[in-house]
A protein has these predicted regions:
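A short, charged, Gly/Pro-tolerant segment at domain boundaries
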Residues: 140-150
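Short, flexible coil/linker segments at domain boundaries that flank nucleotide/cofactor-interacting
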Residues: 2-6, 86
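The C-terminal output helix
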Residues: 129-142
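N-terminal pre-triad scaffold of radical SAM enzymes
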Residues: 12-16
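Cofactor-cradling patches in redox/metallo enzymes
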Residues: 23-128, 132
Length: 150
């Protein structure tokens, strides 16, 4: 069954990371694929991200984290989504995430982790496929992740 409205995705750069080129490339690819994209800009707090996601009624949040702060930021975003009863928002992560951290992040509710060099079509198709089956954060079977970092 086709959606009657475009998928809405919030792309955010949490923490002190100042590199946003990748997030902007992802945002443009999602937009070009027909999705409505809200880009929050640099240095967003988890509170700002969740608040914007709820206000904008998004289907998906994409976090771009290159700073190494994923183990502090992502659990806070998930906790805030749960507090706001917004667990049906699909949560995906992009950036340089070590393999040893990926499994715990996915267990906690991240549906997919996309490392550097992931084809844009892979990201678009994952979001399209999984937004349709929105449910609690842990409902979507995690996409296998393997970083290109040792």
């Amino acid at each position: 069954m086709e959606r009657s409205t475009p998928i809405r995705v919030l792309v955010a750069k949490p923490g002190l990371d100042g590199h946003d080129r990748g997030a902007k490339i992802i945002a443009r690819a999602l937009r070009d694929a027909g999705m409505e994209v809200i880009y929050t800009g640099l240095r967003q707090t988890p509170e700002m991200i969740v608040s914007a996601a709820i206000q904008e009624d998004v289907d998906c949040i994409g976090l771009s984290i290159l700073s190494g702060a994923h183990n502090a930021i992502v659990p806070r975003v998930i906790a805030l989504l749960r507090e706001q009863q917004a667990e049906d928002i699909l949560l995906v992560l992009g950036g340089t995430i070590p393999n040893q951290d990926a499994e715990g992040l996915q267990r906690s509710g991240v549906s997919a982790i996309f490392g550097p060099g992931t084809p844009l079509d892979t990201i678009v198709e994952f979001i399209r496929r999984n937004v349709k089956s929105r449910g609690p954060l842990t409902r979507v079977a995690p996409l296998p992740y393997e970083s290109n970092r040792p």
